[in-house]
Amino acid sequence: MFDWVNLETVAVALAVAYLALAIKENSLCWYCAFFSTAIYVWIFGDVSLYMESALNIYYMAMAVYGWYQWQRGGEQNSGLSISRWNPRQHINAILLIALATAVSGYALATNTDARLPYLDSFTTWAAVLTTVMVARKVIDNWLYWIVINSASIYLYWDRELYQTAALLVLYIVLSVIGYRFWLKSLQQQNLAANSLVNKVQTPVYATASANSR
């Protein structure tokens, strides 16, 4: 096995930078995500976590997509605003993750030497969906990441990726912080929207009152 410890350190540092910037809604986070995941494609393949390796190829593509969405994905090519999912969307997401986990977990268990195939599959498919949530600025992504990263800690520790396992402990803490930051931004966003509606309605009401005299 290649001595990838130093390379893992670089990937971890970039991953921390990604999350710190994402919390602040800074689109530079996607540059850090792209290069960090490029490194992890090789690392995970080397330790027989094939679903995780494939996941990071997907992450690289999503880094490009996420950057575009944060820059131009909103109305009139403006940046996206924070949103949240309704209960039905969460139920559909969970069912989709469960189905994909069962299918790919079985395929890996019967056809490859993959380690912990079902856990590997769960964290992979859950992360696939949650990354879309991040790219679309769905606030609930932070809660999903807490679950995914908690499960992934054991997966990486088992494969002796100790720095990455430690990174995920930090990720859980930062996910809580990220949720609080985005929730505050969402509240401010809603307050600004309500204020704008009131400003638009006030002149209409004033005109109607004047005409009735």
Predicted regions and their residues:
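Early transmembrane hairpin module of multi-pass membrane proteins
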Residues: 13-18, 26, 30-66
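Short, flexible micro-motifs
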Residues: 51, 69, 163
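Membrane-water interface of transmembrane alpha-helices
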Residues: 58-75, 183
